[in-house]
């Protein structure tokens, strides 16, 4: 492997996908690393919104350097239900905020948490997302999370990581643990 030259540095598109847990957690870890290196981070959660997750308080000490916004109402399309118009409206609002943030260049890293679900449920056009990612300022990094990443986004991404479950405590009847899984 050759050593990257300074002129080869650029903003990256990263995707955390797959059926295993840890996609959001990995993105948060990258966000923490970025803040530690003096970068500004915006994380928009497209689906989460009705629960109070630990990361909401975890980023508070970073002030304006790490902003996390829940944009949804929580679970959508549960049990094969039709898309609720309110959920669709919230995804559209989240996407517009994400698009403007990415294109503004005000953020070094923009994390689009659970965007793959919004795309997979037909709530957001993957072509719109791809176009914005390709038009972003050169040094803006973007992370997309959620299962079943769309093929178009995988194609344009620089790094794609697929999480897979090998073993999960839930299989032993152990419920999700606050501070570890939410």
Located regions from the model:
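Short, glycine/charged-enriched secondary-structure capping and boundary segments
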Residues: 29-30, 56-59, 84, 124-128, ...
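Phosphate-binding/switch loop-helix module in NTP-utilizing enzymes
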Residues: 78-141
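Phosphate-binding/switch region of NTP-binding enzymes
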Residues: 147-182
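Extreme N-terminal, non-catalytic leader segments
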Residues: 1-13
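ASCE RecA-like P-loop NTPase motor cores
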Residues: 12, 141-144
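Hydrophobic/aromatic ligand-binding patch that stacks against planar heteroaromatic rings
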Residues: 33, 58, 132, 152-153
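Conserved nucleotide-binding/hydrolysis micro-motifs of P-loop NTPases
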Residues: 47-51, 74-75, 116-117, 148-151, ...
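Conserved P-loop
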Residues: 12-103
């Amino acid at each position: 492997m050759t050593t990257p030259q300074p002129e080869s540095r650029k903003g990256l598109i990263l995707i955390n996908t797959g059926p295993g847990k840890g996609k959001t957690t990995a993105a948060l870890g990258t966000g923490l690393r970025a803040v530690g290196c003096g970068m500004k981070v915006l994380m928009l959660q497209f689906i989460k919104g009705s629960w109070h997750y630990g990361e909401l308080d975890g980023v508070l000490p970073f002030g304006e350097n790490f902003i996390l916004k829940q944009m949804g109402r929580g679970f959508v399309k549960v049990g094969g239900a039709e898309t609720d118009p309110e959920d669709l409206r919230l995804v559209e609002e989240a996407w517009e905020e994400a698009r403007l943030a990415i294109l503004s260049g005000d953020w070094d890293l923009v994390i689009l948490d659970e965007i793959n679900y919004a795309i997979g449920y037909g709530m957001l056009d993957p072509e719109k997302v791809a176009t914005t990612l390709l038009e972003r300022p050169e040094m803006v990094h973007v992370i997309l999370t959620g299962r079943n990443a769309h093929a178009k986004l995988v194609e344009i991404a620089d790094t794609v990581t697929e999480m897979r479950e090998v073993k999960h405590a839930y299989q032993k009847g152990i419920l999700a643990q606050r501070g570890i899984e939410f």
